[in-house]
Amino acid sequence: FDPGLINEAIATAPSEFTLHARNPQHSVTMNGDNIVFNMMASAPNCSDTDRGRRAGNQEDYRNFLRLAQMHNILHVTGGYPVEPVDIHPSVRHLDCIQDYITLTDKAYCIYALGEDRVSDAIEMTRIAHGLTRDPMRDQACMFSIINTNSPLQLDIPMTQGLMALAEMGQLVVITPFTLAGAMAPVTRAGAITLQNAEALAGVALSQMVRPGAPVMYGGFTSNVD
């Protein structure tokens, strides 16, 4: 991208916005002074003292959501706390979002794995919030982590998801998947430079789709050791 194009696009990104929960008491304001905690996401396994380590499943997924709802230190639920691999991937997002809606009243994270799944998530969330499509464009109710396919690439499903969410005014967190020594330079400076370039490209794309759409700069840079 041309530097001038990037600067012009990111200038429309909002410095503050609200992520709306179905329970207004759990809505959170995103800005430079607020810290928002959520669960980790996408663990393949879980464990406890009774049954030990096991593959992710819907029962445990639901129990983690109940914990997220109960704990006041978690402001939003985040993504799938454990991946429910007992649900077929083609319909997993439908079951997981239904569980979000029925077991929590906090904002949640959906997975931007293509336009169709994002459209399902938008429609289910819209209904749960009692909104029509136009008001929803001005009320961020969910978010998604958009990982780049480093180096310097956004794959098609993530790009489709990013654009669909931005068009509907829903929050996207652009998070480059940069591992130093693998898909990023091995030096700290090089890896962070790549992260910044990829993140700014994603932020700019969201604003090209809909100026003023809520967007955040995420970072994942680590190493392969």
Where are these regions (language model features)?
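Glycine-rich, N-terminal phosphate-binding loop and its surrounding beta-alpha-beta segment
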Residues: 1-47
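Helix-rich catalytic cores of soluble enzyme domains
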Residues: 49-225
